[in-house]
């Protein structure tokens, strides 16, 4: 990943090996135009696990109307401030959801497949919850 500072700003452009660009940094006070590095970490955790869950459920032939993940975290009080507790809530929407298969898919992601989840466990207590809607 190549990261370039956008001169005169608090923004950086990150370009991944495929050439896809993402702007990260901090916005001017009162504006929330771009994602912070820590918010991107939480998003990466959710996407990593979400990709696993969707792929596993597809193989299990589980149909969903919708699926979302809410990720919240607490920061330490002292610098360097980092996430010391993270909660990942998996929200599943649909009729006659197969809870057993859904729970198995989430468990496989959390315990076996999601590398970002494993990285987070190195510095944070990670809790997961499953919600059915």
Model-derived regions, located:
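Extended beta-strand/beta-hairpin segments
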Residues: 1-43, 54-133
């Amino acid at each position: 990943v190549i990261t370039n500072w956008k001169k005169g700003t608090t923004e950086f452009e990150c370009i991944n090996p495929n050439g896809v660009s993402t702007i990260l940094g901090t916005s001017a006070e009162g504006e929330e135009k771009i994602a912070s590095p820590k918010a991107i970490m939480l998003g990466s955790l959710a996407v990593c696990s979400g990709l696993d869950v969707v792929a596993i459920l597809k193989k299990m032939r589980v149909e969903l109307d919708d699926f979302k993940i809410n990720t919240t975290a607490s920061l330490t009080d002292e610098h360097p401030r980092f996430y010391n507790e993270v909660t990942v809530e998996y929200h599943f929407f649909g009729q006659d959801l197969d809870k057993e298969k859904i729970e198995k898919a989430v468990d496989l992601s959390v315990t076996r497949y999601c590398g970002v989840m494993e990285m987070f466990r190195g510095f944070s207590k990670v809790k997961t919850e499953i919600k059915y809607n």
